[in-house]
Amino acid sequence: MKTIILFVTFLALSSSSLADETETEFHYKPGEIADPSKWSSIKAEWKICGTGKRQSPINLTPKIARIVHNSTEILQTYYKPVEAILKNRGFDMKVKWEDDAGKIVINDTDYKLVQSHWHAPSEHFLDGQRLAMELHMVHKSVEGHLAVIGVLFREGEPNAFISRIMDKIHKIADVQDGEVSIGKIDPREFGWDLTKFYEYRGSLTTPPCTEDVMWTIINKVGTVSREQIDVLTDARRGGYEKNARPAQPLNGRLVYLNEQSSPSPTPRLRIPRVGPV
């Protein structure tokens, strides 16, 4: 069990809002009929993709962030290795656990790990730079509230977890909706570090672009090899070679940079749970 000081807010969303369907009607390639600039006009329920003021991703930098050394929320992780499946959804590769792979606990509420997936290049920018890849760890409570943790990667040494499942990725690379067992996977193998992280209110990065999702983005950047990036990219179907939404305007939102260590105590800051605004 690992205990981290953290403040996170959540939004109740339907499972369809996680872009879990493979019958997608949006693309990423600029100039296409369904590229990100046109998402808001494809469906009425996607209008907020163009009109929303709290859209994601954004550029994260200390210059726009409020530094926080302590918060009033405690996040505890209780992960365990269980059998998992890798699925090619066409627009990304998703890891889904067949049984209970554990949870995070915040404010005495359990949030079960639902799935993990990758975007390449990264969706969030760090100090003005779009990195090579971004991992999303999605957790959900029984009430439907989400807690999403994003981990950024730059090109460099191979990522240990992706190396472990490379042969499985190859196996379903050309199979739409293809699934393959990847054995027992411990979520801790993804290797994220919560000693320093950004948080802000944003949205889903895919339609319907629902707002008031609180993003927690790890400041420590991992590495992934060029070969691994190419394998994941090549596995996606046309229009999804780069499955990253462009950066969205900040529109005056507060961004917090939580640093776990401080030479002197700082006032504790409570971030209210997301609600109607």
Swiss-Prot record:
Induction: Accumulates in low CO(2) conditions. SMART domains: Carb_anhydrase. Disulfide bonds join 49-209. Zn(2+) binds at residues 117, 119, 136. GO terms for cellular component: chloroplast stroma. It is found in: Plastid, Chloroplast stroma. It catalyses: hydrogencarbonate + H(+) = CO2 + H2O. It comes from the Eukaryota. Its cofactor is Zn(2+). Residues 257-277 are annotated as: Disordered. Expressed in flowers and siliques. Keywords: Chloroplast, Disulfide bond, Glycoprotein, Lyase, Metal-binding, Plastid, Signal, Zinc. PROSITE patterns: ALPHA_CA_2. GO terms for biological process: response to carbon dioxide. PANTHER family: ALPHA CARBONIC ANHYDRASE 3 (PTHR18952:SF267), CARBONIC ANHYDRASE (PTHR18952). Belongs to the alpha-class carbonic anhydrase family. This is Alpha carbonic anhydrase 3. It comes from Arabidopsis thaliana (Mouse-ear cress). The lineage of its organism: Eukaryota, Viridiplantae, Streptophyta, Embryophyta, Tracheophyta.
